[in-house]
Structure formats: structure tokens, C-alpha cells
């Protein structure tokens, strides 16, 4: 039935049946059928051609203009005419999130790959009653556990000191007295290794080659007022040589060495040796500057505790540790200083006081960590109070830069940052390019729709005829599938994904309120239009299809 059929007294179904009967008995039946076939063929070809032109021509023009026209123009103006990298706030947040994730991944990988970074409770072995002179034989056990250094995100390094006391001359053991680990002190420093020069003290060192020198002051330190703090060198690797794995210090202190008791020059002298590449000092003299500025050497040559085999002449690289008790509180102030071939010109340092080690607070996370992993019951001993030995070790050779994984970390992080900057800069350029190219494609589509009215009418007629030629059950199934996909119960999730993609595609800020508003209104509009089409057109042309569709919905 068509809209042009007239309504008469005889039902139209009877008229159509009579017409079909007339065509079947008419001798020229083939000619109308051929004409109908040719018209259907023409309608099919025209529809395919129209659909191809309307769909693919705008698409190809969109791709071409995006690559060869808009992309170069946008890159030129975006990279050269302004300095922004991110087109909107969401791109910036994504970049920062990736940087944070990359930093956490680097830190995680570093903890996994670094051996003994957070070791368990240290294992050490010391015989209870060593024979005289056996201390050099125990250096491996001593040096392996004496100082542990740990890194925390709070920019702190933690040092653990073990102290021993022995009844002897400076390095020898006499009377066969026992030696055990004694008291333990935990210290933290905001920077791993700094230096302190004790007030009014000027320590000098004299190596076996006869060269001596004091610790130098920088130009900045010379400008400081009395009592101000100064920093000689910021980190341990800035020494003329840096500690290697399993390298250790030996520290000793001797009261009244070469100074008569009761004099104003009476002081405790601190000294130690740094085994490096299997060697130590052969001999070393220590002394103190008197009130007249003269260097007063000790009365005896000090022999090193450690054996001298494979010892290089490392006297030029001697290092001190100065130690002083603070106001009788039991808190220790420690410092490092150095003189060597790479040190600046020698200058006197006076009236300078720079503390770098501070006792850990009881509630600090570093102290909690030590108490959980490193606490032990240490035995004490008391031979005499005149000679003390302190052992400090770097067994794991961890970098002394706070929260620094390795030498390549900064370059790797910088490279990743540049990669992210380039990536999101290209994302911004792509978003602007997509917007311009899609507008061009839309303009071409509208132009074709206006100039191809007849072809599009034929296409519409062909599609309508194809749809209505189906059985009622098939038509109802297609209609149900279409409505459930676009306006069904689960469709809001799909529309949300589509709108998120469109916002990202065009570089628009993803406002969730706007997206939820579109998801809540656009499917409702489509549902209303679809129901109007069913009521206005489909109910007139195919009532059986409408009845089947309603039955399937129910």
C-alpha cells in the first residue's frame, strides 16, 4: 500500500489481488518485470555510490588535511609562538601522576636490586678472651659490623658507632685482657657526612714523607663571624679518595699524649687510619698547636693497628675524626676533616664550630628502625680508661648522597621527564589538530548533503524498501536491538565512554558534571524521537511490526 492509493468501496486488498492475477495472465508480463529489475538495480547502485561519497569522502579529506595541512601549522604555532606544554589541566595532572609513579618504581627497583640495603640484625663474632696482639687478626669481624649507614626518604643518614676500650699502649695489647664490643650510639645527620672544627683547636698531621698541614678554610668560611657554623666539604666522596666497599676507619684517642698534665694545652688527641686498597699508613705522627701557634708533635711515632702488607703510602690522604662530649650529657659531637694533595691552600681554622651528628630522638622512625633490626645485647669491658678504640666501617659502600640511588638516577629521571614533556606536548598538538580536521570533515559532509539531494532521496527510498521487505519478526528484532543499545538499561556506561573519548579527542577539559548531564539527556532525546517515528510512520506502514515489537518488549 502506498499513500497515493485511493480509498473506494472495494477493499484495497481485493484490488491488489485482482491486479496480480491480471499481470499473471497477461501475455506481456516479462516486460514490466524487466523494468522493475532495472529500476531496482539502478536504485541499488545509486544508493551505494551515494553512501560511499557521503561517508568516505569527508573521512579521507579529514585524514589528508590533518596530516599535511593542520598538523604542520599547529606544530609551528604551538612550539614557536608560545611556551605552554599542556593544553588543559587534565593533561598536566596525568603527566605529574606518571612522574610520581616512575619515581616510586625507580625507588622500588633500587630497593630490590641493592644488596643489604635494609639488612637484618647484623651478625658479628668476637672471641671473649683474645690473646695479646690478636686484635689485628679480628679486623674482618670488627670492620664488617661496626658502622651501618641507611637512607630514608626524610633526607637523613643514620650512623651506628661501636666503641671499645683496651688496656694497653696506643695500639698494643698487654696483660691478655679481654676485648668486647662496648657501648652503642645512634646518630643521624641531615646530610650524610659533614665536618666540624672544634673551637680554638687546630689539628695537624705529619706523614712519613715529612709533609704536614692544617685543615683549609674556604673563602666563605673566612667571612663567618665568631661562633657561626661552616661546612668544609659537603659529602664524603669529595675527599681526595672515597670509601670503597668493606673499607673501614680505625679511630683511637689517648689522653695527655706528649703534653704535661695540668697545662692549658692538655687535650685528648683523636686519630684513625683509613685502609684503602688493602693498605694503611706505615707511620703517622700526631700533634697539636700550642698557644704560640707552634706545632708540637707527639713524643712517639704511632704505628697503625692494621697490618701493613700491601700498604700504599697514603699519608697525604689522612683523615681525622674529632670527638667531644657535650656539657657532660653523654651526647657525642663528631666531626671529619681532611688534608691531602687535592685540598685547597692550607689555612688556619679557629673559632669555628660545626655540628653534623645529632642524637636520634626516641620517637624518630630511624631509631625505631634501628631498635627493630640492629638492637643487640652488647657486653662491656673495662681495662683502663686511658686508651679507647673506635671502629667505623662502610661495609655496603652505599652512596652517601641522601636519597640518591646511583650516579645515573638524575640523568634517567631527567630523560623520563623530557619524554613525558614531549609526549604531552604532542598530545596537545594532536587535540588541536583533531578539532580543526574534524570541523573540516563536518563542513565537507554538510556540503555533500546539500548538493546530493536527489541521490540521497533515492538512497533513503532504497533503505526503506529494504527494511520493509523483511518479515515482521526480523524488523521487530532489529528495532529492539537498536533501542537497547542506544537507550537501554546499560546504555549510560557506553555513552559515558563515548563522551569521554570525544572530550579527550578534542582536548577539552573533562568536566564530569557536563558528561553526566549529556549521558542523562541525550539517550532520552533519542528514545523520544524513536517512539515518535513508531507512532507517526511505522504504525501506518506496518502495524504488524509494531504489534510484534511491543510483544517482544513486554
Curated annotation (Swiss-Prot):
<protein>
    <recommendedName>
        <fullName>Potassium/proton antiporter CemA</fullName>
    </recommendedName>
</protein>
<dbReference type="GO" id="GO:0015297">
    <property type="term" value="F:antiporter activity"/>
</dbReference>
<dbReference type="GO" id="GO:0015078">
    <property type="term" value="F:proton transmembrane transporter activity"/>
</dbReference>
<dbReference type="InterPro" id="IPR004282">
    <property type="entry name" value="CemA"/>
</dbReference>
<keyword id="KW-0375">Hydrogen ion transport</keyword>
<dbReference type="GO" id="GO:0006813">
    <property type="term" value="P:potassium ion transport"/>
</dbReference>
<comment type="similarity">
    <text>Belongs to the CemA family.</text>
</comment>
<feature type="transmembrane region" description="Helical">
    <location>
        <begin position="429"/>
        <end position="449"/>
    </location>
</feature>
<keyword id="KW-0630">Potassium</keyword>
<keyword id="KW-0472">Membrane</keyword>
<dbReference type="GO" id="GO:0009706">
    <property type="term" value="C:chloroplast inner membrane"/>
</dbReference>
<dbReference type="Pfam" id="PF03040">
    <property type="entry name" value="CemA"/>
</dbReference>
<keyword id="KW-0050">Antiport</keyword>
<keyword id="KW-0406">Ion transport</keyword>
<feature type="transmembrane region" description="Helical">
    <location>
        <begin position="514"/>
        <end position="534"/>
    </location>
</feature>
<keyword id="KW-0813">Transport</keyword>
<feature type="transmembrane region" description="Helical">
    <location>
        <begin position="479"/>
        <end position="499"/>
    </location>
</feature>
<comment type="function">
    <text>Contributes to K(+)/H(+) antiport activity by supporting proton efflux to control proton extrusion and homeostasis in chloroplasts in a light-dependent manner to modulate photosynthesis. Prevents excessive induction of non-photochemical quenching (NPQ) under continuous-light conditions. Indirectly promotes efficient inorganic carbon uptake into chloroplasts.</text>
</comment>
<feature type="region of interest" description="Insert">
    <location>
        <begin position="113"/>
        <end position="410"/>
    </location>
</feature>
<keyword id="KW-0150">Chloroplast</keyword>
<keyword id="KW-0633">Potassium transport</keyword>
<feature type="transmembrane region" description="Helical">
    <location>
        <begin position="50"/>
        <end position="70"/>
    </location>
</feature>
<keyword id="KW-1133">Transmembrane helix</keyword>
<keyword id="KW-0812">Transmembrane</keyword>
<keyword id="KW-0934">Plastid</keyword>
<keyword id="KW-1001">Plastid inner membrane</keyword>
